[in-house]
């Protein structure tokens, strides 16, 4: 079952006040300000935090999830994250980013070969195993699954090919991975959202 979330609109200090409170270089602050001017990018981190809060994840995981979209948009470097938020958060973000290499491998496999159910099943299972092996902290995998849920919600306005590719990736890799890790809520949500496409 898909959870309906609403990014909380509780009173927060303006973005500029929060940004000024961070001890970042002016160049980095400018990048963050540019990224924050596009509301969808900001909401991804908040949505990921809401997903992870439902799983009772620790504060470090929540902070890494909130910072991750900024790193993806190249508004924060890994060094900026380590300096401002700490090594542990940086390591989680790096682990999540490392998992993106699998996306391109899976996309090449889908587009580059004829359908062979047994070989595809073995390939996908080996991808799942690689994902677990390549990250040092399983929390990075959970953050990535939350990010994929957000990606499934965002692709509804994309072209058909993109929607199908993201849905296949989530249904064949991340939903079974969530099941393997015993996180039923994420598994169901990934499957339900992927089924739409």
Model-derived regions: residue spans:
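Active-site helical microenvironments for divalent-metal-assisted chemistry
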Residues: 1-197
């Amino acid at each position: 079952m898909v959870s309906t979330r609403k990014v909380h609109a509780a009173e927060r200090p303006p973005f500029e006040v929060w940004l000024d409170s961070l001890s970042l270089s002016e160049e980095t602050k400018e990048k963050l300000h540019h990224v924050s001017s596009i509301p969808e990018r900001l909401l991804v981190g908040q949505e990921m935090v809401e997903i992870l809060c439902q799983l009772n994840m620790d504060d470090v995981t929540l902070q890494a999830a909130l910072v991750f979209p900024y790193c993806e948009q190249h508004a924060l470097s890994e060094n900026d994250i380590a300096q401002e938020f700490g090594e542990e958060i940086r390591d989680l973000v790096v682990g999540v980013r490392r998992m993106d290499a699998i996306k391109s491998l899976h996309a090449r496999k889908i587009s580059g070969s004829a359908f062979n159910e047994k070989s595809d099943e073995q390939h996908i299972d080996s991808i799942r195993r690689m994902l677990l092996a390549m990250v040092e902290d399983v929390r990075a995998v959970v953050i990535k699954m939350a990010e994929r849920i957000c990606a499934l919600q965002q692709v509804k306005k994309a072209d058909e090919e993109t929607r199908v590719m993201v849905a296949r990736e989530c249904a064949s890799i991340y939903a079974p991975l969530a099941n393997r890790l015993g996180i039923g809520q994420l598994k169901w949500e990934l499957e339900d959202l992927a089924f739409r496409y």
